[in-house]
Structures are given as structure tokens and as C-alpha cells.
Amino acid sequence: MVLAKDLKSGMTFLNGEKLLRVMEASHHKPGKGNTIMRMKLKDVRSGSTFDDTYRPEDKFEQAVIETVTAQYLYSMDDIANFMNNETYEQYEIPVEQVKDELLYVLENTDVKIQFYGTEVIGIQLPTTVVLEVTETQPSIKGATVTGSGKPATMETGLVVNVPDFVEVGTKLEINTQTGEYLKRA
């Protein structure tokens, strides 16, 4: 059991039948009354996010999440296919469940598949990925690193705001947590 006051960002717990992941958690002490925990939560099974409040002493069952390293193979007919790197077992995950993560993943990229018991609940990406720009506005002569930048479409369909000097064919390092351009690869 885990107390609400001990829940941190990234932790997964059970609230009744719902499997919830903490996106953000903060203590809030109103002028009158008791302290409350404000949390932004994600229902792992449905993918929906919502805000909720709990008393610090509320107890929840902490979910044991296991991960295995797997390689993304391909997506077809709304199913993303992955292969366990050790056992070569293949996993099929509905694209709808991992559509945001797939914007950062090329075929043959290693990711971590998360399990709750035998149920696949999602994938965990590496912190950064290298993707190639497939579409962007042409560079402007004299453009510098500073400035507002321009949108660029990556080979996976991800759209990232990049500096003006970036051209089609450039490989860029992208942060998978924020979706931001980091540097040229």
C-alpha cells in the first residue's frame, strides 16, 4: 500500500479497478482545512487524463510494473508489432494505445514494453531519438540559431519547431519527453 502523499510523478497505482499513472502531483494547503494532494492522472488502459484530489492519508495499492526491452517491427491494420529482444516473442499493441509514442519510433528501434501482470499497458521511449527532417521551409540566408524557428516534419510524421538553418535531410536529436529539438545529430 502507498499513501497519496507518497505518490510521485511516474508512479502507477490502483484506484478500485482503474490502473492510474501519476503525471503530476503536488501538495496543496488551503487557508482553511486540511492539506490535499492535487494530481494529474492518466488512466493507463483508456489513455484518458484527468485531474483529481486526495487526502494525504488515502491509501492505494501500488501497481507492480515490469518492463522488457523489445524492438519495434512495424504497424499494420491499427496494430503495432514489437519483438522481445531476448525471447523473440512478439507483442501486438493497438496503435491507438501508443500513437503518441510511435511518433518518436522508427522500425527496428528498441523500446521498453511495460506490463501489469500479463497485460501490456504501454511503451517507454529512450530519452532522446535521432530523426530525419522530411519537410520544412527552405533556409533563409543569414539565419542564425536564435529566433522563433520554423516547423519541420520528421520521417515519422512528428512536427517539431526547429531553428531556421535546418534543411530537409538533416538528422536531428529530439527529446521524447518534451518533443523539442535538442541539436543536430
From Swiss-Prot:
One of its GO terms (biological process) is peptide biosynthetic process. GO terms for molecular function: translation elongation factor activity. PROSITE patterns: EFP. Its main location: cytoplasm. InterPro entries: Elong-fact-P_C, NA-bd_OB-fold, Rib_uL2_dom2, Transl_elong_fac_P/YeiP, Transl_elong_KOW-like, Transl_elong_P/YeiP_cen, Transl_elong_P/YeiP_CS, Transl_elongation_fac_P. Pathway: Protein biosynthesis; polypeptide chain elongation. Gene3D superfamilies: 2.30.30.30, Nucleic acid-binding proteins. It comes from the Bacteria. GO terms for cellular component: cytoplasm. SMART domains: EFP, Elong-fact-P_C. It is found in: Cytoplasm. Keywords: Cytoplasm, Elongation factor, Protein biosynthesis. HAMAP family: EF_P (MF_00141). Belongs to the elongation factor P family. NCBIfam families: efp (TIGR00038), PRK00529.1 (NF001810). Involved in peptide bond synthesis. Stimulates efficient translation and peptide-bond synthesis on native or reconstituted 70S ribosomes in vitro. Probably functions indirectly by altering the affinity of the ribosome for aminoacyl-tRNA, thus increasing their reactivity as acceptors for peptidyl transferase. This is Elongation factor P. The gene is efp.
